[in-house]
């Protein structure tokens, strides 16, 4: 929380004005959180900033004149209503002019009047100059034309929009030829050929040849992928068969060990019986 009793220093006032220029009036919390102004305004709250901005917005002497007019209206009871109205008149508060924040992008409509759009035909000369210099048989896009004109001529900031509109208008008037290609969604413009022949347009035969080559390449790639998949599958089958053989051998070995264990168990039973009989003094004959 801020401390309203502390007198504002020049450094704090400069930080407040700089914060208003950056964030705009009323964005007190944003100004306090901004690392650029946090150190200077560490002892101030958003209410302190609001009150200080209101005091800075009121011209000097306005508040004193308003305060003096109020008691005059109460004491002079015999004056006419017209006189009271004149005494109670307050001077309107001037609206402070705040420059736009540095980070805010100024719209072209705020800088350039509509006269640029109305006077767009005067840019036809530089457009034809750019197309003649670029001399691209397939046409030039808006970006290429703009980057050619911008460093050579003085143009408004919204010239790119004016240029795009003017190119479409000239193409509609048949003063320029608009070229559309299947490789790009952008429109290309060029000066019409006086002989009437079009340059740079691929022939249907060439287009079909390129498509056929692309299809052949795709087929070859697909065949290679199929062969690789078949080889991989065969390797997996061989690996599975090897695992099956190993499992069979393990099962046979387990069966042998089971039989040996059963025979040993039977021999142990016979030996136990013989030991018991011998312990009782009986005679046993072994065949």
UniProtKB/Swiss-Prot annotation:
Residues 93-103 have a biased composition (Pro residues). Residues 233-259 form a coiled coil. The keyword DNA-binding applies. GO terms for cellular component: nucleosome; nucleus. Residues 58-107 are annotated as: Disordered. It comes from the Eukaryota. It is found in: Nucleus; Chromosome. Keywords: Chromosome, Coiled coil, DNA-binding, Nucleus, Transcription, Transcription regulation. InterPro entries: Histone_H1/H5_H15, Homeodomain-like_sf, Myb_dom, SANT/Myb, SMH1-6, WH-like_DNA-bd_sf, WH_DNA-bd_sf. Disulfide bonds: none annotated. The keyword Mitochondrion does not apply. Residues 119-193 form the H15 domain. GO terms for biological process: nucleosome assembly. PROSITE patterns: H15, HTH_MYB. It holds the Pfam family Linker_histone. PANTHER family: SINGLE MYB HISTONE 4 (PTHR46267), TELOMERE REPEAT-BINDING FACTOR 4-RELATED (PTHR46267:SF3). HTH myb-type domain confers double-stranded telomeric DNA-binding while the H15 domain is involved in non-specific DNA-protein interaction and multimerization. Belongs to the histone H1/H5 family. SMH subfamily. Binds preferentially double-stranded telomeric repeats. This is Telomere repeat-binding factor 5. It comes from Arabidopsis thaliana. The lineage of its organism: Eukaryota, Viridiplantae, Streptophyta, Embryophyta, Tracheophyta.
């Amino acid at each position: 929380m801020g401390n309203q009793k502390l007198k504002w220093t020049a450094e704090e006032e400069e930080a407040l004005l700089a914060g208003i220029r950056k964030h705009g009036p009323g964005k007190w919390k944003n100004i306090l959180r901004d690392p650029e102004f946090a150190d200077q305004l560490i002892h101030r709250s958003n209410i302190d900033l609001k009150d200080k901005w209101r005091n800075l917005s009121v011209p000097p002497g306005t508040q004193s004149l308003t305060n003096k007019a109020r008691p005059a209206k109460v004491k002079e009871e015999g004056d006419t209503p017209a006189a009271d109205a004149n005494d109670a008149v307050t001077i309107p508060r001037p609206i402070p002019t705040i420059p736009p924040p540095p980070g805010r992008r100024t719209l072209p409509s705020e800088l350039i009047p509509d006269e640029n759009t109305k006077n767009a035909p005067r840019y036809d000369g530089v457009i034809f100059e750019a197309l003649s210099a670029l001399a691209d048989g397939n046409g030039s896009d808006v970006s290429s034309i703009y980057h050619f004109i911008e460093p050579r001529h003085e143009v408004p900031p919204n010239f790119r929009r004016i240029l795009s509109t003017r190119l479409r208008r000239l193409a509609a008037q048949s003063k320029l030829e608009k070229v559309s290609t299947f490789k790009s969604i952008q429109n290309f413009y060029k000066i019409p050929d006086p002989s009437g022949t079009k340059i740079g347009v691929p022939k249907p035969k060439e287009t079909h040849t390129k498509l056929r080559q692309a299809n052949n390449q795709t087929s070859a790639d697909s065949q290679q992928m199929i062969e690789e998949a078949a080889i991989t599958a065969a390797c997996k089958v061989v690996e599975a068969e090897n695992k099956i053989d190993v499992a069979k051998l393990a099962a046979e070995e387990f069966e042998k060990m089971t039989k040996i264990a059963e025979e040993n168990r039977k021999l142990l039973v016979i030996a136990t019986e013989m030991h018991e009989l011998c312990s009782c003094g009986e005679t046993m004959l072994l065949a």
